[in-house]
Amino acid sequence: MAVTQILVVFASALLLSMFFTGVDSTRSNETWHEHAVENPEEVAAMVDMSIRNSTARRRLGYFSCSTGNPIDDCWRCDRRWQSRRKHLANCAIGFGRNAIGGRDGRYYVVSDPNDDNPVNPKPGTLRHAVIQEEPLWIVFKRDMVITLKEELIMNSFKTIDGRGVNVHIANGACITIQFVTNIIIHGIHIHDCRPTGNAMVRSSPSHYGWRTMADGDGISIFGSSHIWIDHNSLSNCADGLIDAVMASTAITISNNYFTHHNEVMLLGHSDTYTRDKVMQVTIAYNHFGEGLIQRMPRCRHGYFHVVNNDYTHWEMYAIGGSASPTINSQGNRYLAPRNRFAKEVTKRDYAGQWQWRHWNWRSEGDLFLNGAFFTRSGSGLGASYARASSLAAKSSSLVGVITYNAGALNCRGGRRC
């Protein structure tokens, strides 16, 4: 593993946003900036400094087995991972690299898969765990399928860690990350999520309120920051698999396995919602697999680093956008479908060529197979992509190895994961 390609986070780095816990879903739009990274230029400067200054790096390869995947090399080769679970929080990369989840709190063991009462959840249930005000690292006592009656509304500073067991959130409502900060979701199967709502749901020990109908996303990120979604398997939900909207930022989506879905990932609320210009999202080391159609992702306004992903299936297109997002595609592998009318990786919406030719979309070091092609636009200069750069890309020839274990892992205690 090349040390110059390891993202550095300095212990003395300037805090990028203020952290708040337990913000109720009834808060007004004017509070959304509380969780935003307010200065994307500052983030870009820190990332650039991190990549160039390898002498002061954080050593993600502490237990390295040199897979080439810096996240996995950080923790997976440690046979004692089960007793050192919280080390995972030191392994994030990209724009969501400062997400610590429940690292500084106690462990909470989920022992009950039921979700009988979304207003008064029982201790031992996942819902009871995620609504608490304190930081928590949430683990599971055994294999379980959790069918949620209503959205699982998370409070700040939580980690959901499915390693060591087989946990499915399926066949009901799924996960909502709204007006909160510092969330890690790792090692969960999320599928067959359905619209729910028009019901009372608790969001903290001191608050519950009326929830209108939810779309049926696998993971919905709304007005939140410092989010890391890693090593999950997602498929077949009613709306998106992962949606991030309403000035959400400082997000990393990594090592996930996406299958059997139409509109995979939406990043940005609407063309008219300009607050999404603060959005910075890293999409790294994911496998976009069989049965996918479009939106991998579909972007608006912000800055998006798409790096070292494996795109083996799409039916319409892979990466789309509108409202002048900056898209930095580096070191990905794009395998086009057989359909000769669907070879293009990219798609621009709601703009003529005279408009989108100014949008900064670049491809650098990508591998194109079976006739795949990426339509570039805007500036080709590196400086134009500073705010859409979050880590050093590896060679696209390594993508198959880097993404080989994408999705929820089969980890067992006492063994390398």
From Swiss-Prot:
Binding site for Ca(2+): D215, D239, D243
Signal peptide: 1-25
One of the record's GO molecular function terms: pectate lyase activity
Cofactor(s) essential for the protein: Ca(2+)
GO biological process: pectin catabolic process
Pathway: Glycan metabolism; pectin degradation; 2-dehydro-3-deoxy-D-gluconate from pectin: step 2/5
CC cofactor note: Binds 1 Ca(2+) ion. Required for its activity.
One Pfam family here: Pectate_lyase_4
InterPro entries to which the protein is assigned, alphabetical: AmbAllergen, Pec_lyase, Pectin_lyas_fold, Pectin_lyase_fold/virulence, PEL
Keyword line: Calcium, Glycoprotein, Lyase, Metal-binding, Signal
Annotated EC: 4.2.2.2
Glycosylated residues in this chain: N29, N53
Enzyme class: lyase
Reactions catalysed, as given in the entry: Eliminative cleavage of (1->4)-alpha-D-galacturonan to give oligosaccharides with 4-deoxy-alpha-D-galact-4-enuronosyl groups at their non-reducing ends
Domain of life per record: Eukaryota
PANTHER family: PECTATE LYASE 18-RELATED, PECTATE LYASE 20-RELATED
Protein name stated in the entry: Probable pectate lyase 20
Organism listed in the record: Arabidopsis thaliana (Mouse-ear cress)
